[in-house]
Swiss-Prot record:
ATP binds at residues 39-44, 68, 209-210. The lineage of its organism: Bacteria, Bacillati, Cyanobacteriota, Cyanophyceae, Synechococcales. Its cofactor is [4Fe-4S] cluster. This is Light-independent protochlorophyllide reductase iron-sulfur ATP-binding protein. Pathway: Porphyrin-containing compound metabolism; chlorophyll biosynthesis (light-independent). Component of the dark-operative protochlorophyllide reductase (DPOR) that uses Mg-ATP and reduced ferredoxin to reduce ring D of protochlorophyllide (Pchlide) to form chlorophyllide a (Chlide). This reaction is light-independent. The L component serves as a unique electron donor to the NB-component of the complex, and binds Mg-ATP. NCBIfam families: DPOR_bchL. It comes from Prochlorococcus marinus (strain MIT 9313). It catalyses: chlorophyllide a + oxidized 2[4Fe-4S]-[ferredoxin] + 2 ADP + 2 phosphate = protochlorophyllide a + reduced 2[4Fe-4S]-[ferredoxin] + 2 ATP + 2 H2O. Homodimer. Protochlorophyllide reductase is composed of three subunits; ChlL, ChlN and ChlB. The gene is chlL. Its EC number is 1.3.7.7.
């Protein structure tokens, strides 16, 4: 059961969505939450990273945490029903469901779940995420999983959409080499630090996406203590893979940039499996970001 509690350790006067402590992802699984500015390419990044983990022989589960429910369509090649939609069909009697009602197999055996969300302007996305994890646990679907990836809505860092951080070992932040993306990343760093006071989640690093250069990202990293873990340039093959509803690993490896992207995703996956050193980063004040990046 999800309740709302005041947690001063998360920030003075903060109110956070607190999940049932008994609903936990099994110990031993690598759990990653992927955040970043809206439209930055988190779903593409998450799906390709899931595919990379599967290529390394891992059993992977990707959970989409966005009401748009488009996180996993490049893995499944279609838009799958959401957990919240399926639960509504059975009047929220989860015992009536079978695993294949809400979990779908995607590329190379990756398991895919879309949590969905409440109607616009109502409810809490964090509650839906909590119900999704609870449902997976009830059906013993987390017991044979090596890697779990939460693909989280935009850069919303309220108590609800910060809920995946309560399950994660690491948070990866997707950004571009521009002011708006970095500004959003700074807010996400603050949210992760707040959650880290009460949960095991730690910063894993930065994924630079659709960026030819890294100068602004690296300038920010140096000031905050972040580190770039992977760099994906503005490769047209990634755009085309979305149009074809497939991962970069299903594209022709002879096409320009495809092999380079595949290797970068495999390298990132291996770094995470090797227990990357958590980062101790400190966010900047808004004014400091403007001074650092805004007036060159």
């Amino acid at each position: 059961m999800t309740t709302t509690l005041t947690r001063p350790a998360d920030g003075e006067g903060s109110v956070q969505v607190q999940q049932d402590a008994s609903v936990r992802i099994q110990e031993g699984a690598l759990v990653i939450a992927v955040y970043g500015k809206g439209g930055i390419g988190k779903s593409t990044t998450s799906s390709n990273l899931s595919a990379a983990f599967s290529k390394l022989g891992k059993r992977v589960l990707q959970i989409g945490c966005d009401p748009k429910h488009d996180s996993t369509f490049t893995l499944t090649h279609r838009m799958v029903p959401t957990v919240i939609d399926i639960l509504e069909e059975v009047d929220f009697h989860s015992e009536e469901l079978r695993p294949d009602d809400f979990m779908f197999e995607g590329f190379n055996g990756v398991k895919c779940v879309e949590s969905g969300g409440p109607p616009a302007g109502t409810g809490c996305g964090g509650y839906v995420t909590g119900q999704t994890v609870k449902l997976l646990k009830e059906h013993h679907l987390l017991e044979d999983t090596d890697v779990v990836i939460f693909d989280v809505l935009g850069d919303v860092v309220c108590g609800g959409f910060a809920a995946p951080l309560q399950h994660a070992n690491y948070c990866l932040i997707v950004t571009a080499n521009d002011f708006d993306s970095i500004f959003a990343m700074n807010r996400i760093v603050a949210a992760i630090n707040a959650k880290a006071k009460n949960y095991k989640v730690r910063l894993g690093g930065v994924i630079a996406n659709r960026s030819a250069e890294l100068d602004q990202i690296e300038k920010f990293n140096q000031q905050t203590g972040l580190k770039t873990m992977a760099h994906f340039k503005n490769v047209d093959a990634i755009r085309r893979s979305r149009l074809k509803k497939c991962t970069i690993f299903e594209m022709d490896s002879s096409d320009e940039g495809v092999m380079e992207c595949q290797n970068e995703y495999l390298s990132l996956a291996q770094k995470m499996l090797d227990n990357v050193e958590p980062l101790e980063a400190e966010p900047l004040k808004d004014r400091e970001i403007f001074d650092l990046l805004g007036f060159d």
